[in-house]
A protein has these predicted regions:
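Enriched for short, Lys/Arg-rich terminal
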Residues: 67-70, 75-99
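Basic, Lys/Arg-enriched alpha-helical interface segments
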Residues: 1-62, 78, 96
């Protein structure tokens, strides 16, 4: 059975900011980008451990999927069968801020 995917406030803000930035030059590309990110993270709902453990945190429950140059960071909550999308982080920004 799939896990429910829940976007945190930070992750929603990250995605919104990225889509708005891209749409300044290319609205169609921005829409495609946003939908591709959502589709990619939905994979974590089907296969929660598909992503690698976030190396900076080294916690089994904290994973990431690459969407170059971004890191789609999520938490696995097995007890409630929920995957929380935590951040959409540009890899050039260094270590992700989890708060």
């Amino acid at each position: 059975m799939d896990y429910k995917v829940v976007w945190t406030k930070s992750a929603r803000a990250d995605l919104k900011q990225l889509v708005e930035y891209i749409s300044e030059d290319n609205p169609a590309a921005a829409e495609h980008f946003g939908l591709a990110i959502i589709e990619k993270i939905e994979t974590a709902g089907k296969f929660p451990r598909i992503g690698r453990i976030v190396p900076e945190e080294d916690q089994e429950f904290l994973r990431e999927l690459p969407y170059s140059p971004y890191r789609l960071i999520y938490e696995i909550h097995d007890d409630t069968r929920i995957v929380y999308v935590v951040r959409i982080w540009h890899s050039y920004r260094g270590s992700p801020e989890m708060s």
